Amino acid sequence: MKKIIALIAALGLATTVFATREVTLLMDWFPQGNQSGYFQAQFDNQYHDDVKIIIKSGGPKINTTAQVAAGSVEFGLQASDSVMLANSKGAKLKGIFVSLNHVPYTLVYHPNTGVNSVKDLDGRPFAVKIGVTYWKWVKQKYGLNKVKEFPLKGDLGLFARTPQQFQQGYSLFLPARLDAKGVPNEQITVESLGYRPYSVLFTTDKLIKEDPELVQTVVDRLSISFHKSLVDPKPTRDFILSKSKKVNAEIHNNAIELMKQDFLPADWSKIGCQDPNRWVEVANQMKEVNVLPADFDPHQSYDTSFKKGCFK
């Protein structure tokens, strides 16, 4: 009897030692195509018994950086400028894996309304996420001081009925959604105006210090899953479309093709890599509009050590 009890105890200990570690990656929005690689990592849990990756959707009322900083989730997806803004307030976060070379912010407007450059948008109504950093920089850089800002609610009908209005969106999705509804549109991407924050997965300094092997495992898994989701996009596409009411297969497929053309490195093994100079560039732009203090150090907001093969 004692031997049986000892065996059960030993098995229990082994279960504890080799238990799968579960980590949550909080997205910056509802499920959409640019998150495909993350969802692929969740699908691939069946092939791994060490770390289980759970993808949690974000949304307009979810503060990703705050939740990661508080320890509610282990990892989050957000723009690199948002990571630095949070760090300027003491969050102690670090970007570890870049999933898009720049956040696809865009300004969508009606054609044939006298817009030949971004400066022609001055004085018009603008549906925007109030307080978003990129717009503070664009507004100052291009002297757009008469724009009539109002909170973005995603109402495409209002845009369709208001020829002078322009609207914030993602270049991967908004123009195609308007096309699908028969609403003529043109766009000026924020990246083309010179503001290019990364879309980056981040975690806490604390987790990096206490469990670097876990962080490394997540980055390694993502490097594989992003490549896999591009080679065979159907599983993640089917899942994302099952969760989305605003995007159809054509819009989703178009977004993936745009990502390949303009948002991902030609060498997919480099997906995840980040250039320190890009963090400095965006930090300097944020300082220009007094979003960051002059002495803020952007090098404390990223860690390039986990994504291998970036600097060969």
What are these regions (language model features)?
Residues 1-4:
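Positively charged n-region of N-terminal signal peptides that target proteins for export
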Residues 14-17:
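N-terminal signal peptide c-region/cleavage motif recognized by signal peptidases
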Residues 21-151, 158-169:
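Short, glycine-/small- and polar/acidic-enriched structural segments
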Residues 41-42, 105-115, 198-214, 267:
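A bilobed periplasmic-binding-protein/Venus flytrap-type ligand-binding module shared by bacterial periplasmic
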Residues 50-53, 183, 245, 271:
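N-terminal secretory/targeting leader peptides
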Residues 81-82, 152-248:
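Pocket-lining segment of extracytoplasmic ligand-binding domains
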Residues 211-291:
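Secondary-structure end/capping motifs
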Residues 279-312:
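Conserved C-terminal helix/tail region of periplasmic/extracytoplasmic solute-binding proteins
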